[in-house]
Each structure stands twice: as C-alpha cells, then as structure tokens.
C-alpha cells in the first residue's frame, strides 16, 4: 500500500487539515490474478475523506473498473463530448425546456442525410433518396416517414433532432397544445389538425412553454390518419 497525502490549514485556529489523498492498494493478490486499486479521496464539506475516483483492476484480463463520484447527489461534469463504445445505463434522463433560440435542444440527434441549406428549427422528413426535405401534411409522401427538426444548416454537421425538447422557428400554438404537421406551411407544425381531403393528420409533439418561443416536446407518432 502506498499513500500520498495533501495537507494545509483551515481558517479557524488555524488547524491542520488533510484535504486530499491518493491511496494505492492491492485489490487481488491471488497468483496469476493480481490486480490493484487506486483511490483518489478529497475532504468533503466536513473534512471527512470520501472517494472521488476509484480505479480497480477487473475480474478478467485487461478489464479496469472505474467509479466516479460518491453519493447520488454528487455531480460529474464533462466539458465536451463523452463517447460510450458499449452500453450506457442511466436511471434518469433529464430533459430541460429549451431556450428561446431556434434550434436549441436536448434529446436524440442524428447526423446523416447530406442535406445543406436547412432552416434551423424547421421540421423535415427523411426522403427515399437519403436526404431531408421540409414536411407538409397535404400529401402522405411528405410527412409519413422519419421526421426531425433541423438544428442548423447542415444535417451531417449540425444534426437533426428525432426526439426531445427543441425550439422551433415558428409559433405553433399555446402551452399544452397537441401539435400536428402543418398542411399550409412547409416545415411547420400547428395546433390545428389538417382538415382538407387527402391531408395527413399526424401528431408530432406538444407545446411545453411560451408559444412565441416555440418550445416544444418533439416526439412524432408512428401512425397517422388520412382525411377523407
């Protein structure tokens, strides 16, 4: 076992305090299965040493297990992208209402389609040629498949939101309204269901905040109705 400790003073008497330490220990001393454990501890609020990062040799060759944080109320902040190459398990996924800025979002995003000159905050459908085009509910072909909200001018760079909180580029209705693909304006949604013969009635989400900001929960239904 090896320990590196970091001491300083508090602002009281002053008194000496240990503010952090690094502890290296044996995790498994079994011959042929040797593994170690490295623990990073910090003083947490009352001076008590608690684990902040624990790195442990796994139960198989080349496996390393890592535990970050201490109790459930601890916060881990990643300033940038996080890449998970296997499974991700999360007890809760928090969606926050988007801001007043068109294209602000939180949710599931794809980066494909090779489409440029998209309108940020407009609704698009995925075409049979592999590109995106603004929706319109006057025919099934322009709104019956995969739908998404453009998050910028280029689908492969800025992304297209498939589900989540997002700010669209128009005023669709009032708070709590059910929203439908619009038959009158390409790329829009509306709280008024299309009613013309041959029009498609498809729910795409709900208004969740001030209508003039265009904050919606975008979650297109997989079914639709054609007006007779």
Spans of model-derived segments:
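Glycine-anchored, exposed beta-strand/edge motif detector
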Residues: 11-18, 29-33, 39, 43, ...
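Beta-strand-rich receptor-binding modules of extracellular spikes/adhesins
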Residues: 1-87
